[in-house]
UniProtKB/Swiss-Prot annotation:
Entry GO CC: cytosol
Lineage of the species this protein comes from: Bacteria, Pseudomonadati, Pseudomonadota, Betaproteobacteria, Burkholderiales
Protein's recorded name: Ribosome-binding factor A
Keywords: Cytoplasm, Ribosome biogenesis
Complexes and interactors: Monomer. Binds 30S ribosomal subunits, but not 50S ribosomal subunits or 70S ribosomes.
Originating organism: Bordetella pertussis (strain Tohama I / ATCC BAA-589 / NCTC 13251)
Example GO biological process: maturation of SSU-rRNA
Membership in a protein family: Belongs to the RbfA family.
Gene3D superfamilies: 3.30.300.20
HAMAP family per UniProt: RbfA
Alphabetized InterPro entries for the sequence: KH_dom-like_a/b (IPR015946), RbfA (IPR000238), RbfA_dom_sf (IPR023799)
UniProt-annotated location(s): Cytoplasm
Cited function: One of several proteins that assist in the late maturation steps of the functional core of the 30S ribosomal subunit. Associates with free 30S ribosomal subunits (but not with 30S subunits that are part of 70S ribosomes or polysomes). Required for efficient processing of 16S rRNA. May interact with the 5'-terminal helix region of 16S rRNA.
Matches recorded under Pfam families: RBFA
Length: 133
């Protein structure tokens, strides 16, 4: 006999990930003193297929990403318990905070592009011709 497979609800994973991101951002902003960790922005949540684990991606301004990750992961158990109070689901995922390097790379690329477009001898963009009148 074959076992009945449960079918996941389409889009549930994305909706739950978005809700976890919103709730965590609010909890962190209201309840945790993150002055040592700089300004933290949650950039996304990735859930495992069984909803048991969540990678929470963040960016940080004004501090080292490793310091912020250590502080957030130190608070992960408490944040999990706070999420349990807010989410009405059977299993609240365990949280693991991971620095999101894509935002930082995007900023670095933007700086490089701006620098390359700046007029000057080493920029690749010719200087403006001087008015000879």
């Amino acid at each position: 006999m074959s076992r009945h497979k449960s079918k996941s609800i389409p889009g549930r994973n994305l909706r739950l990930a978005d809700q976890i991101q919103k709730d965590l951002a609010g909890i962190i902003q209201r309840e945790i003193d993150m002055t040592r960790a700089g300004l933290i922005t949650l950039s996304g949540v990735e859930l495992s297929a069984d909803y048991a684990h969540a990678k929470v991606y963040f960016t940080v301004l004004g501090a080292e990403p490793d310091t912020a990750a250590a502080l957030l992961n130190e608070k992960a158990g408490w944040l999990h318990s706070q999420l349990y109070k807010l989410l009405h689901i059977h299993t609240v995922p365990t949280l693991r905070f991971v620095h999101d390097p894509q935002i930082t790379r995007g900023i670095e690329m933007s700086v490089l592009i701006d620098r390359a477009n700046r007029p000057g001898p080493h920029s690749g963009v010719p200087d403006e011709p001087e008015d000879q009148s």
